[in-house]
């Protein structure tokens, strides 16, 4: 519950920067990961785990692509 609280506040108050959006989405994924680990079955948990890894990698690719092709683009500073 704490990860969801932190991620929602980070998403609301720091939405101008791409890196903070990606971090807040990772915290949301972590809170869902912890919540669903008790609820879902084994195969659905494996599917959700694969989805979370793929979304994390795609988020990093988007951030690196923005920094490479568009300059800083509010990614870091």
Curated annotation (Swiss-Prot):
It comes from the Eukaryota. It is a multi-pass membrane protein. Keywords: Electron transport, Membrane, Mitochondrion, NAD, Respiratory chain, Translocase, Transmembrane, Transmembrane helix, Transport, Ubiquinone. The chain crosses the membrane at residues 15-37, 44-64. It catalyses: a ubiquinone + NADH + 5 H(+)(in) = a ubiquinol + NAD(+) + 4 H(+)(out). It is found in: Mitochondrion membrane. Its EC number is 7.1.1.2. One of its GO terms (cellular component) is mitochondrial membrane. GO terms for biological process: mitochondrial electron transport, NADH to ubiquinone. One of its GO terms (molecular function) is NADH dehydrogenase (ubiquinone) activity. It is an enzyme of class 7 (translocase). Belongs to the complex I subunit 4L family. Core subunit of the mitochondrial membrane respiratory chain NADH dehydrogenase (Complex I) that is believed to belong to the minimal assembly required for catalysis. Complex I functions in the transfer of electrons from NADH to the respiratory chain. The immediate electron acceptor for the enzyme is believed to be ubiquinone. This is NADH-ubiquinone oxidoreductase chain 4L. It comes from Caenorhabditis elegans.
């Amino acid at each position: 519950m704490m990860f969801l609280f932190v991620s929602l506040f980070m998403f609301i108050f720091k939405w101008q920067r791409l890196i903070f959006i990606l971090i807040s989405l990772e915290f949301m994924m972590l809170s869902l990961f912890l919540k669903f680990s008790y609820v879902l079955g084994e195969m659905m948990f494996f599917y959700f785990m694969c989805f979370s890894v793929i979304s994390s990698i795609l988020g990093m690719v988007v951030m690196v692509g923005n920094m490479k092709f568009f300059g800083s683009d509010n990614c870091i500073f």
